[in-house]
Structures are given as C-alpha cells and as structure tokens.
C-alpha cells in the first residue's frame, strides 16, 4: 500500500519516517511531504491507498482524482472540511483524532477570557517595556455571561469550565441538545 502524508502534521519528517519503519519493513511505501500545499493535494495523493492530513479541505474533485484511496486519516478532531458523503459513496474509511484536544482547547478558551478581562497581554507589555503603570487589574469572569457556539465535546467542556468560574452559560448548537446549567438560545441571541 502507498501511504501519503499530505503534510508533516507539525512533526519533523525524520520523526514520521522513524515511526513508519515497521510499515516500510512490511513492504508499504510511505511518502511524507514537507509542507502544506493544498493546490498540490491531488497530484500528491493521486495513487495513494491511504492519505493522512490535518485540516485541509478535501472535496469531491480530490476523491475523483484518487481512485485507489481506501482510507483517510485526519490528524484533527473535526471533519467538516471533508466531503464525508463522497467518502461514503466511494467506500473510503475516514478516521479522525476525536477527543485528543478537548481539554486543551477548552482551557485555552477560558485562559483567553480571563486574559481579556484581566488585561494580561497589555499589562505584560507595559511591564516588560517599563513604559508606565499597568492598567487596572480588570474584572473577574465570575457572574459574566459566556456564549458557546457548538456543544460538541469542546463546547461542552468549555461550558463546564466557565460554570466552574461562576459564569452564566448560554449556547447555540446546530442540533437540539440539553446540557445541565446551559441555556440554549438561537444564533441571534448569542451574537
């Protein structure tokens, strides 16, 4: 089988090559491209059996140009950049890295909220440049209303963390969903 990495996925090519030694020893061909180049995706994957990538959009034209493709491995949680209907029609197995970053992304969202309310970036710059007195310490996020767009794993975890800080959480989700302590609203209300 020919396995094509359309991009290095944030890893060194040496590391990917090292991780793929067993595959190569078993007779598989592994090709790793050193950069993200969406306009070359079709050319790079045309004769691949397996394609590995993160979040570059792959649509019907890509799958039409890759008749041997049997599997698509997405090193990312979301799949909204993949034409899943076309994959299903062609019998292409699609796998993703579901759940790998849920906690990290939710924590980052909370960090950004705290940073915004507490003027962390501005105060850091003022302090490092010795250019004056820091801004006021800002405000707490407790008792603020936090809006969450999408209640997948990341959205639910972000809502739960916001609740732990004493926030009122409102959310919009594409499909109806009930989450304890979260008020579901329409998009217009959220924005």
Regions found by a protein language model. Give the residues of each.
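Rossmann-like adenosine-cofactor binding region
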Residues: 59-63, 175-191
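Rossmann-fold NAD(P) dinucleotide-binding segment
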Residues: 57-69, 84-86
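Phosphate-binding beta-alpha-beta segment of Rossmann-like dinucleotide-binding domains, i.e.
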Residues: 90-92, 97-145, 149, 160, ...
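Hydrophobic/small residue at the entry helix of a nucleotide-binding pocket
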Residues: 154
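A short, aliphatic-rich alpha-helical micro-motif
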Residues: 44-45, 63-66, 141, 189-191
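N-terminal glycine-/charge-rich "phosphate-binding" loop or analogous flexible N-terminal tail
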Residues: 1-48
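Rossmann-fold NAD(P)-binding glycine/threonine-rich loop
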Residues: 80-92
């Amino acid at each position: 089988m020919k396995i094509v990495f359309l991009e290095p996925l944030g890893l060194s090519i040496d590391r990917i090559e090292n991780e793929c030694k067993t595959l190569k020893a078993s007779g598989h061909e592994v090709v790793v491209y050193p950069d993200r180049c969406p306009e070359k995706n079709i050319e790079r994957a045309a004769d691949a059996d397996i394609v590995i990538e993160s979040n570059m959009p792959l649509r019907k034209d890509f799958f039409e140009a890759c008749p041997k493709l049997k599997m698509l491995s997405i090193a990312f949680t979301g799949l909204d950049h993949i034409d899943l209907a076309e994959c299903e029609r062609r019998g292409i197995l699609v796998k993703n890295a579901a759940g790998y970053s849920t906690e990290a992304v939710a924590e980052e969202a909370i960090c950004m909220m705290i940073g915004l309310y507490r003027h962390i970036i501005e105060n850091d710059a003022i302090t490092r440049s010795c250019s004056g007195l820091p801004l006021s310490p800002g405000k707490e996020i407790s008792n603020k209303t936090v809006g969450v767009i999408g209640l997948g794993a990341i959205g639910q975890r972000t809502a739960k963390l916001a609740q732990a800080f004493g926030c009122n959480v409102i959310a919009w989700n594409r499909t109806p969903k009930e989450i304890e302590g979260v008020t579901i609203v329409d998009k217009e209300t959220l924005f």
